[in-house]
Amino acid sequence: MKELIFLLMLGLFGGMLSGFIGSGGAFVLPPGMMAIGAPGAIAVASNMCHKFPKAMIGAWRRLQVGHLDFRIAGLMATAAIFGVQAGIYIQSIVAKKLGPAGTNLYVTMAFLIVLPTVSYFCIRDVIQSRKHGIDDTEPLLARKLEKKFKLPPMVHFKTAGVTQSLWLTLPTGFATGFLAATIAVGGFVGVPSIIYLLGAPSVVASGTELGIAFVMGSTGTFSWAWFLGAVDFRMTVLILAGSLIGVQVGAVGTTYIKQYMIKLAMAVVMLQVTLDRKSTRL
């Protein structure tokens, strides 16, 4: 019974994060499932399975308030499909050669490396925004890429209000899909990438990522279940039940807060999960 309640509350919290910052809560859910004994590969696969219906609802809500760029979502989702398949292949190799302990170590070490890095950039950008009294700014890296990286074709993203090279957008999508399949995280890399590489506003980046997550989740779930049988549908249903409520609460919340708060919330949660995984590892 304790595990049931834990999974429901975990899903609720993950759903709120998904609707609020566009991440899908992937950096919270797999560690939570692993904390109650789920092997790393099953935690990754089950998270991906629950992701796409939740992401579909969140994307629809964000579309209604104009926070989803269809062109970014379409291009990145196409590349993400290939990234997902590559990620599943790598994860399957780790599982075959090192077993459940190897997948647990792989997932944990990836969290400990990537999460603090992304958190640093988010916090730095928030400090710069507040220092200059601006709610949300186009990051310096994105401005430089927009001016100097002009490898055609150049694509204009109307909702995001930026123009970037197709050859910058596609690798960003591939990397998002790869991480989503290997360590269950895509959104916490996808959202910062859309912000810091493509230059989209925070609310558009988080809303667009939900559309990408829907495509990644639906295609990735099929591959995980069909080829590796790694999806635990009981855990998936429990987490999804909580997430479907949480994602709507989180999506509504974005209309009432300043954009820099999305980055700050993302950074704080990432650091908390990093500390939790580090203590678990130790």
Predicted regions and their residues:
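A helix-boundary/kink motif common to multi-pass secondary transporters
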Residues: 22, 39, 69, 95, ...
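Structural signature of hydrophobic alpha-helical transmembrane segments
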Residues: 39-52, 210, 229-243
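Juxtamembrane transmembrane-helix boundary motif
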Residues: 1-10, 64-175, 226-282
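Juxtamembrane transmembrane-helix termini in multi-pass membrane transport proteins
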Residues: 21, 26-73
